[in-house]
């Protein structure tokens, strides 16, 4: 089977832009361990917020028949995706929730204050709070991305989170949660990806097959030989797609299904195209998105299921 990426990263900008960035970096490296900010490096390595905001808005409208206006980004970190959602339309609002105060403060200074004007800022709210404790205001859509819900290590805790998402959504609202897996993610290994002026290193550091706990780390290395070791450290549980689907259904979501990423046969990595599948491929590593919809008020489970069945999603 084709081997896919095992690193939890999202598609970056266009190939032309990547080549341009790399060319500039080759002339004069921008980053060293002393000067580089880890959040900047993370956003350049892992996130594609403008693209994600566009894609999830498109998926939401395909599933529901209405535009995505109110978004909640759980585990939002620097809230860059929420910022881009607010920028997309003058009626868009966003709520970003994260426990880490310094990360939220960094996001406000470097993302909110630089990407948004005063009117747009008025439509964005950032909360330093536990995602289990936030229910208001209800949102059209909740995103739980970059596998951050994996901080919940037992079924009871993750189930409580999914139930809270259900209660926090408006009728007909959507929950999207990305997931990763495959035999390759269980191996102790370090994947290195060159970026413009630095190298992103995804370290699958430790895995316990009994608890399904995995420790992952992100390191950054630079052309001058310096490094930022363990810039980010994650203590996660690897949740299976079957477990996630069951928890979504138990919480009350309807038409719970999986969008499975296809393979780029030229390089064996993910191709950024997600399609609904009932049976996954036996790939060494894979990326997928679990989708659930809260029933419309007064509607049964059949109507929304029929409306969304068979639709495909693209992230490119």
Please give the residue ranges for each predicted region.
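A short glycine-rich, Lys/Arg-flanked "PGG" loop and its adjoining helix->strand segment in the class I
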Residues: 158-171
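Conserved SAM-binding loop
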Residues: 107-108
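Conserved SAM-binding strand-loop segment of SAM-dependent methyltransferases
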Residues: 115-131
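SAM-dependent methyltransferase
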Residues: 176-247
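A short acidic, Gly/Pro-enriched loop at the edge of an enzyme's catalytic core
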Residues: 132-142
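Conserved SAM-binding loop of SAM-dependent methyltransferases across substrates and taxa
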Residues: 78-91
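Conserved class I S-adenosyl-L-methionine
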Residues: 67-77
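C-terminal lobe and adjacent flexible extensions of AdoMet/dcAdoMet transferase-like proteins
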Residues: 238-316
């Amino acid at each position: 089977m084709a081997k896919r990426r095992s690193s939890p990263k999202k598609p970056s900008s266009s190939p032309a832009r990547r080549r341009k960035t790399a060319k500039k970096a080759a002339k004069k490296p921008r980053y060293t361990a002393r000067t580089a900010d880890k959040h900047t490096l993370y956003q350049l390595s892992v996130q594609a917020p403008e693209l994600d905001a566009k894609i999830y808005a498109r998926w939401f409208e395909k599933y529901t028949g209405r535009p995505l206006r109110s978004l909640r980004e759980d585990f939002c970190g620097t809230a860059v995706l929420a910022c881009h959602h607010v920028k997309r339309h003058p009626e868009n609002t966003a709520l970003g929730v994260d426990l880490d105060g310094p990360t939220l403060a960094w996001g406000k200074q470097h993302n909110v204050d630089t990407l948004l004007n005063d009117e747009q800022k008025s439509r964005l709210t950032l909360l330093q709070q536990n995602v289990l404790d936030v229910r208001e205001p209800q949102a059209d859509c909740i995103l739980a991305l970059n596998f951050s819900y994996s901080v919940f290590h037992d079924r009871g805790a993750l189930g409580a989170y999914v139930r809270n998402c259900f209660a926090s959504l408006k009728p007909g609202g959507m929950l999207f949660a990305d997931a990763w897996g495959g035999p390759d993610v269980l191996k102790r290994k370090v994947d290195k990806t060159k970026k413009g002026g630095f190298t992103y290193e995804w370290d699958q550091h430790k895995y316990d097959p009994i608890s399904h706990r995995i420790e992952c780390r992100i390191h950054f290395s630079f052309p001058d030989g310096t490094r930022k070791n363990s810039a980010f450290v994650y203590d996660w549980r690897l949740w299976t797609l079957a477990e996630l689907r069951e928890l979504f259904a138990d919480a009350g979501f309807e038409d719970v299904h999986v969008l499975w990423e296809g393979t780029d046969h030229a390089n064996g990595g993910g191709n950024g195209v997600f399609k609904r599948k009932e049976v996954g491929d036996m790939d060494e590593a894979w990326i997928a998105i679990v989708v659930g919809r809260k029933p419309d008020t007064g509607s049964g489970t059949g109507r929304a299921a029929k409306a969304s069945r068979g639709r495909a999603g693209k992230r490119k």
